Amino acid sequence: MAEESSMEGSEKEEIDSSGGGFGDMASMDSIESRWVIQDDDDSEIGVDDDNDGFDGTGLESDEDEIPEHRLIRTGPRVDSFDVEALEVPGAPRNDYEDLTVGRKVLLAFQTLGVVFGDVGTSPLYTFSVMFSKSPVQEKEDVIGALSLVLYTLLLVPLIKYVLVVLWANDDGEGGTFALYSLISRHAKISLIPNQLRSDTRISSFRLKVPCPELERSLKLKEKLENSLILKKILLVLVLAGTSMVIADGVVTPAMSVMSAVGGLKVGVDVVEQDQVVMISVAFLVILFSLQKYGTSKMGLVVGPALLIWFCSLAGIGIYNLIKYDSSVYRAFNPVHIYYFFKRNSINAWYALGGCILCATGSEALFADLCYFSVRSVQLTFVCLVLPCLMLGYMGQAAYLMENHADASQAFFSSVPGSAFWPVLFIANIAALIASRTMTTATFSCIKQSTALGCFPRLKIIHTSRKFMGQIYIPVLNWFLLAVCLVVVCSISSIDEIGNAYGMAELGVMMTTTILVTLIMLLIWQINIVIVIAFLVVFLGVELVFFSSVIASVGDGSWIILVFAVIMFGIMYIWNYGSKLRYETEVEQKLSMDLMRELGCNLGTIRAPGIGLLYNELVKGVPAIFGHFLTTLPAIHSMVIFVCIKYVPVPVVPQNERFLFRRVCTKSYHLFRCIARYGYKDARKETHQAFEQLLIESLEKFIRREAQERSLESDGNDDSDSEEDFPGSRVVIGPNGSMYSMGVPLLSEYRDLNKPIMEMNTSSDHTNHHPFDTSSDSSVSEAEQSLERELSFIHKAKESGVVYLLGHGDIRARKDSWFIKKLVINYFYTFLRKNCRRGIANLSVPQSHLMQVGMTYMV
């Protein structure tokens, strides 16, 4: 097969721990580039500047027995000191790393309103749900229940999430799909086979450092990449966890708001449960209506409210400890947990379903991390949130020691009479904030899953110009509201909603535990004993809690379980259909024999202009191009196959956005452009801006390609006369500058924008110009060829740019199984017709659009 030229705009180099060691890196400065043999994945279709070595059709001759190894420029070398610091110069950094101290304090203050609302409102209902399953018989029951709550708080939110899981973020991005993305960067586990080796040269893609556990990590990587079953299991696990996150986004508002509004029954005797439901519905409508105003704006508003709430929890707790029974401090002795189970047996086991509610919101700490930094979340939780929560629970326990009958409304009954109405007011505000916390986490998770091909396309609005992670999804917002209202109206019992709440939360927790364990083995490469201890302790505890809530699934929580199954089905069907479609496109791509037969005119008329043909292939000529050739009376003089590809990184730097390749020879004027985006990237550019960036990147690619050819030809000439011209070796720097590799090294440089011909003069200027004067004629021809091609691009651009899109219909083959026909022909087709159209998603103007229909038989 012929080869295809590849040139990447990457400015960084992957640090591969499997080769070389770091001693070689010190040989050059950290900003220098090097030339390496072209990767296998960068070779596919023939290219050449001239006709040398090519047959009459213009494509590479099949008679060449020795493959031609093209040299490509990699990114700059990474200094060993940068490796030790785990930093790469120029690599994208987290949005929050360069903030001032004052800004970090303000950021920590905002975390109260965005991250901790969910876990902060858990005292409203935890004891109420626990004692509904295991009624209080004596004071020791209260001590045992408090001990369970305290150690659950310490074990799950603090140790697991704040101290461990937060560090598994993907460049500041948290959530289930962020963990999956992090694993995908280190092992090819995606079921859609569109990975390229060139993706690993993105500066933010990977940073591997040798360590003693590397061999174990490589073995695990090999197993994951070679086992289709393991890939599917991992995908199912991630989709199940994501569906539980979405379910959590439904049940959290229902639980928090109804618990807060239910306090009216304590203050006003005439208030009934039906009235509580009606007020809760009104509050929920207001809550979801305010969601569009963004996290930054709302964070400044709700931050003070949550601060007052946490201070109220601590104040009420201290008051009750002083007034009632301070002996509840005995609950810090874990032996009371044993006594609690010994006295209450099966009821104590059921009570675990209520106990886990004290840790609800733990996943939001991680999922909402994209809005804030790890340090701000850790600082706020340890210094403010955890102490206030523990004092609040201890205060309720002190009150219940002498008032067993008030266990059904433990929180509001423990509030002093003079402070009841202010606390009720701030509790409702806090409940609304808590609901918003999980909704924002759901938005983040859906955006990640959409970018990674596991959820239908939706309209995403970025609510902040400064921070890309702050988003709002209108369709999902109103969908969550509708389902939430159904839950509130159909399940009016706090106990039943609490059971559903625990089920959704535990589903996400168990998924996170397994994924973080894989990260420990594959990426962190820490001691196996620590990994096993983490998995056994946390997964074991979560399974015990889950066994409690699943036993009560018939009490009404089955609604949330059904909802989660539906969301899982949507995501799996979308991923399955997308995978089949991509595989079909790969199978049906046009062969190089056909391209050779068509010739440079492609068997039709070439009209002036540029055609941007959007497709999903990263290699080969898409089949839809053949449909355009047979359908349209003419095709554009220049065609660029544009592939919008999301890579498993949060952000792709702008200077590494486009990866260009030449398809066939120069006379064909065919190129492939892979526009790479991270799942956190905001695609806000207009079509004019996108066209401008694309054309500029194409020109840079052509210039650098010409320089490669020039360097290769110079290298061949210099092989016979290296002693006469010691300064003839040249590299290209990261900014496009050309460096002479004479003695001393890097003695001088020439700017990329200067014509190549200017660097080749007569022999009396050899000391100032690195090129051999004997190659003046060949360089002149190369320069003229370069200028002609650049002029051709400019004229084509002036003639206009047209977007060529294929409107594909996906159908299952007639010989397919019935289930496959049902899934593809009905479910997947329904999702495609009702998701956001590709035209809107790509910002393609209607006046510059051409579409051709095509049916894919999968």
UniProtKB/Swiss-Prot annotation:
It is found in: Cell membrane. It is a multi-pass membrane protein. GO terms for molecular function: adenylate cyclase activity; potassium ion transmembrane transporter activity. Disulfide bonds: none annotated. Residues 126-147, 254-269, 319-345, 402-413, 492-496, 540-552 are extracellular. The modification Phosphoserine is found at S719, S721. Its main location: membrane. One of its GO terms (biological process) is potassium ion transport. The keyword Glycosyltransferase does not apply. Residues 1-16, 38-53, 714-725 have a biased composition (Acidic residues). Keywords: Cell membrane, Ion transport, Membrane, Phosphoprotein, Potassium, Potassium transport, Transmembrane, Transmembrane helix, Transport. Residues 1-68, 707-731 are annotated as: Disordered. The chain crosses the membrane at residues 105-125, 148-168, 233-253, 270-290, 298-318, 346-366, 381-401, 414-434, 471-491, 497-517, 519-539, 553-573. One of its GO terms (cellular component) is vacuole. Residues 1-104, 169-232, 291-297, 367-380, 435-470, 518, 574-858 are cytoplasmic. The keyword Ion transport applies. Probable potassium transporter. Belongs to the HAK/KUP transporter (TC 2.A.72.3) family. PANTHER family: OSMOTIC STRESS POTASSIUM TRANSPORTER, POTASSIUM TRANSPORTER 7. This is Potassium transporter 7.
